[in-house]
Amino acid sequence: MLDVSCLYIIMCKKFRYLIVLKRFIIIWILLVGVLEVRAQYDPSYSHYFDMEPSFNPAAVGKQSKLNVTAAYALDMAGFEHNPRTFQVAADMPFFLFNHRHGVGLSLQNDQIGLFTHQRLALQYALQNKLLGGTLSVGVQGGMLSEKFDGSKVDLGESSDPAFSTSDVNGSGMDLSLGLYYQHKAWYVGLSAQHLTSPTINLGETNELKIDATYYLTGGYNIRLRNPFLTIKPSVLVTTDGTTWRGDLTGRLVYQYEKRMLYGGVT
């Protein structure tokens, strides 16, 4: 039969093992996620069909009016440091030298764990008539800002200089290109984000590698007998050359004069 002192020693050893295991898990996460990140960098939205300029600069100015969008995404609600994304953007068309152009501006703030990704981008597109539709060629230039909140990392008594326990940040330039073809009833777009694959240094020992990401999108408008109803299927495929994601959406849209209501599933 164990006495109280032996039981206390056993419990202390188990507690110590739990602390060591916790530190090991934290260090492993930092090794995978802080030293060099090679995952898809951009956030995804279920309403991608209304936010095409966020991944294809050639889509700016495709509407005949000023277009302003704002989106907020919250994942894993209730968990500490859960992913949160906010984006606001605006674009509009204009005419110059007998050509239609598009210009846009977007601001994004994306928080994932102890990382904060920010992007400020300016977009431009040139539109030309082609085969009964409109072909748009777009370019986007911007600034990426990265921050890691190391002050919230608990490594216990460890003093390993590879793991920052203070706030570190860095920035870099970013370049994206896109093509967008729009016909009467359908459209297709192809774009590449982060073409320069920038590497952003976070302090003296860590870096964030951002791989180029490619997007293919398309959609079709199916008119029904009711002139106010339209079925709009659409698709978005995203890949960085290693992993990929596909979104398939179907919407039923009711539109009468300036009023619009839709429902769908992705």
Model-derived features: positions:
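Bacterial Sec-dependent N-terminal signal peptides
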Residues: 1-44, 50, 250
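Subset of outer-membrane beta-barrel
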Residues: 40-266
